[in-house]
Amino acid sequence: MSDFENKIEELGGKAKEAVGEATENEQLADEGRADQTKADVKQAVSDAGDKIKGAADKVLGSFQKDEEN
C-alpha cells in the first residue's frame, strides 16, 4: 500500500471518528479510531521496509565497489 493510500485511510478514519462523536455513535467513532491505527501500522511497516531496502542497497553497493577494485 502506498503512502498516499495509507493517508487516505487515515483521513477516512478521522472523518468516521468525528461523525461518530458528533452523532454520539460510539461504535462508529471506535471504527474510525481503528481505521486510523490500521493506517498508522501499515505506514510504519512500509517505512521499515523502505529502510531495510535502503540498507540492503547500500551493502550491495559496497560489495560491487569491492569487486571493481
Swiss-Prot record:
For region Disordered, the annotated ranges are: 1-42
Alphabetical list of Pfam families matching this protein? CsbD
Lineage, top-rank taxon, reads Bacteria
TM spans (from-to): none
Q: Where is the composition biased (Basic and acidic residues)?
A: 1-19, 30-41
- What family is this protein classified in? Belongs to the UPF0337 (CsbD) family.
What is the name of the protein in this document? Answer: UPF0337 protein DIP1660
Species whose genome carries this gene:
Corynebacterium diphtheriae (strain ATCC 700971 / NCTC 13129 / Biotype gravis)
